[in-house]
């Protein structure tokens, strides 16, 4: 079987892991790498991500990459604060027939709830080129897709659903992303993620998509933001030393009201230290260990409590995208949702 030829975009914290996965995957061939940092231009992709030389030289020249006529783009770059640019970046490739697997174009999670100015150009480009688009998600994606839907499919009736996502981000180096959540700031200040359209496009659309799966209409969506500091300094990868009194834990609660009651709730809890905000939802799994924990609570005829901890949880984000590439390349053109394609298997070694 011919290998799928892939161009990767982005070599940040997640991108490096994603590019490494592409290099390792025997079903894929890395043929191009788009980078934003001038110091990375001209370097071998393997050198950038800590792998042996590949012969693929990083570039910032999109036209040169377009000429490669690859099967798929694996988009790992951040779109925070640059949504329009990120859309424009991939449109020519979609128009040329190159498929797109992305962790970052969040409006495509459930396009009918995304911002039209970001969704429409992508859909039109895919239609023109006969290409496919799949957003796999960033945190790491499956908890609001296959995992949740499989759980709900095992129940006869449901009264309420609560999803809690918890991450220890002390060793996460994404400074700008954490600033969007208000870390290392005054806890009284509402951060950009809560006050701008960004948060709505990330999570409100997701809740509406889950409501569609439940075949229910959302009557109202409410959001609440909490931030707490600690009384001791914290050493972090993103900020260096975070002083006492600065935001060290954030909790974002988004609730979808259906049938006259709060039926679906999502909470995202991030901590710069595992002992921050002890009064909030926590986990004994991997305590003090970098990773991502998901808890799912379902009340209904068959009540359910599930907790899943991934020690290298953030690494799942690019891995899910890379595993999906062969399926997306072979799928019908258009926008794909996670439930549209089969569960993608890992490599066995």
Name the predicted role of every residue range:
Residues 9, 13, 17, 68, ...:
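Conserved active-site and cofactor/substrate-binding residues in soluble primary-metabolism enzymes
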Residues 274-275, 282-349:
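C-terminal helical cap and adjacent loop that interface with cofactors, partners, or active-site loops
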Residues 9, 153-280, 311, 318:
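Active-site-lining helix/loop region of Rossmann-like oxidoreductase modules
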Residues 99-101:
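A short hydrophobic/small-residue beta-strand
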Residues 12-14, 81, 107-110, 114-115, ...:
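Gly/Ser/Thr-rich loops at beta-strand to alpha-helix junctions
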Residues 142-153:
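Alpha-helical support elements that line or immediately flank enzyme active sites
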Residues 1-95:
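N-terminal glycine-/serine-/threonine-rich beta1-alpha1-beta2 phosphate-ribose binding loop
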Residues 87, 104-131:
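Rossmann-fold NAD(P)-binding glycine/threonine-rich loop
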């Amino acid at each position: 079987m011919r290998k799928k030829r892939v161009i990767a975009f982005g070599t940040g914290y997640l991108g490096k892991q994603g590019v490494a996965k592409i290099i390792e995957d025997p079903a894929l061939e890395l043929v191009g790498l788009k980078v934003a940092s001038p110091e990375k231009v001209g370097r071998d992709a393997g050198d950038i991500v800590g792998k042996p030389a590949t012969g693929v030289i990083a570039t910032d020249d999109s036209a040169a990459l377009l000429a490669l006529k690859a099967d798929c783009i694996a988009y790992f770059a951040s779109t925070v604060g640059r949504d329009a640019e990120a859309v424009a970046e991939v449109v020519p490739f979609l128009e040329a027939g190159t498929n797109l697997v992305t962790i970052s174009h969040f409006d495509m999670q459930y396009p009918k709830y995304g911002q039209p100015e970001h969704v429409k150009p992508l859909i039109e480009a895919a239609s023109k080129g006969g290409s496919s688009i799949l957003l796999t998600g960033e945190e790491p994606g499956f908890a609001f897709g296959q995992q949740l839907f499989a759980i709900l499919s095992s129940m006869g009736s449901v009264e309420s659903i609560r999803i809690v996502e918890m991450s220890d981000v002390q060793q996460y180096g994404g400074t700008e992303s954490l600033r969007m959540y208000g870390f290392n700031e005054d806890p009284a200040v509402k951060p950009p993620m809560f006050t701008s359209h960004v948060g709505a496009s990330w999570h409100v659309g997701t809740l509406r998509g889950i409501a569609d799966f439940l075949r229910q209409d959302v009557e109202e969506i409410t959001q609440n933001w909490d931030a707490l500091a600690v009384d001791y300094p914290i050493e972090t990868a993103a900020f260096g030393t975070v002083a006492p009194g600065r935001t060290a834990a954030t909790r974002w609660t988004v609730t979808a009201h259906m049938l006259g009651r709060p039926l679906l709730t999502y909470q995202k809890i991030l901590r710069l230290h595992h002992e921050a905000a002890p009064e909030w939802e926590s986990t004994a799994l991997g305590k003090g260990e970098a990773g991502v924990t998901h808890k799912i609570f379902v009340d209904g005829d068959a009540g359910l409590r599930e907790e899943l901890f991934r020690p290298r949880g953030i690494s799942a984000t690019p891995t899910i995208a890379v595993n999906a590439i062969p399926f997306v390349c072979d799928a019908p053109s258009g926008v794909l949702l996670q439930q549209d394609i089969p569960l993608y298997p890992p490599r066995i070694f």
